[in-house]
Amino acid sequence: MSDLPIFDSNAPPSDRREELAMAGFRVDPTHEGPQFYTLLAVGGDNERPLVADGRIVFFVRTTLVHKALAMDPSLAVLGNPPRGVETICDVAQTLYLVNSQDEDPDGVVLDCLLIFDDLVRATGISMPGRYQGILTELAARLTEGDSLKKIFTNESLRDHVEDALLWCVGAITMKARLLTS
């Protein structure tokens, strides 16, 4: 998703200061709340996750945030980590909404797409063009305020989006490191 045109890469650099944000992830629909976390550098021109040795660093408890942050010197210079979760990438809910719902009043799908964009770019794995195209279009339509019902005019489109999302999950998983202690 390195070419995902959610923002204009030709725009002049921003004067905004980068800061750290904690993102929580839920993949099991039977689990309440996040199952694991990562840190993201946000507010600049290169939003990115915590990376060490070419792998995205996730951690299973927020108490591991300092240990995780120490693994990525480029993010560590941004300061102390946030104390709480600032955004959620609810993969389970996103898949449910994409598969069967007509509305996403809380913007769960768009939030997930935006975080996946940063994570997939960090993997260095090239996303297949058909998946990149469909997720880019979905993000654009959701940003414009279109409902899922208006976007998904047929079931096969839902299936294609699900395939693209699951490709992202696989790419991120293959380039992940999970801190458990």
Regions found by a protein language model. Name each.
Residues 3, 18-19, 32, 47, ...:
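Glutamate identity and glutamate-enriched acidic tracts
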Residues 2-78:
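Short N-terminal edge-element motif at the start of the domain
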